[in-house]
Curated annotation (Swiss-Prot):
Residues 1-24 form the signal peptide. GO terms for biological process: cell wall organization; chaperone-mediated protein folding. The gene is fimB. It is found in: Periplasm. This is Chaperone protein FimB/FhaD. It comes from Bordetella pertussis (strain Tohama I / ATCC BAA-589 / NCTC 13251).
Length: 244
């Protein structure tokens, strides 16, 4: 889950959504889970959050298709959620309800593999009190969670899809990683050789039924170690041989 922050001044809430990527600040709104799975045919899926801070928080939520800079009203996605805007008081919770309603132009998603979108949650702190003064720094915090749309009838088990990855050394000093499954495989980290001496990548999302590449350092590595994140945010270590 990625988090963004920026200075909040007189600008409207919409301008705050154009936050640039920066180190994470401490968020009052705590979201349950690190990713969202929408199973095709389900009437809805939900995302829960709670305000663990000391002050009310204004929350705005929307879904994008991967363009983090797009404004909510500029994005066309086959989902809608409610509520898109809410006040969450300290110690209270809020549930986002996400519904699949298809594209307005009738475009369909692939039925043989997962599709990925992003859930955005923007947290805006309350205005500074007179006691705090007008010079106080206020930060908006934007969290982005992957939202996977999972069609019915996909083969295999999404919880063990990472075990099916294959690795091949190509003549040009590149490691080819192939994901033969219909699921996205999310790697927390991949290392080639001891402690990544021959190459590493952190993090890495491998699209279904496709291949990606990593430039290698040297030619001596015989295996890779990688750590995969499952639907529930758990991390499982794997090791696999590199084919020549």
């Amino acid at each position: 889950m990625a988090r963004w922050r920026r200075r909040l001044g007189v600008a409207a809430l919409g301008a705050a959504m154009l936050a640039s990527l920066a180190p994470a600040a401490r968020a009052s709104l705590v979201i349950t889970g690190t990713r969202v799975i929408y199973n095709a045919g389900s009437p809805e899926t939900t995302v829960k959050m709670s305000n663990e801070g000391q002050a009310p928080a204004l929350m705005q939520a929307w879904i994008d298709d991967g363009n983090a800079e797009a404004k909510p009203d500029e994005v066309q996605v086959p989902f809608f959620l409610t509520p898109p805007l809410a006040r969450v008081d300290p110690g209270k919770g809020q549930t986002l309800r996400i519904f699949f309603n298809g594209y307005p132009d009738g475009k369909t998603l692939p039925s043989d593999r997962e599709s990925v979108f992003w859930l955005n949650v923007l947290e805006v702190p309350p205005k500074a009190t007179p006691e705090e003064g007008h010079g106080v720094l206020q930060l908006t915090i934007r969290s982005r969670l992957k939202l996977f749309y999972r069609p019915k009838g996909l083969s295999g088990n999404p919880l063990t899809a990472a075990a099916d990855l294959t690795f091949k050394r190509k003549p040009n000093g590149v490691l080819e990683v192939h994901n033969p499954t219909p699921y996205y495989v999310n790697l927390q980290k991949l290392e080639v050789g001891e402690n990544g001496a021959h190459g590493s990548k952190t993090p890495w999302m491998l699209a279904p039924l496709s291949s990606d590449e990593l430039r290698l350092k040297g030619t001596g590595a015989k295996s890779v170690q990688y750590w995969a994140i499952d639907d529930f945010g758990g991390v499982t270590p794997y090791q696999a041989a590199i084919a020549d």
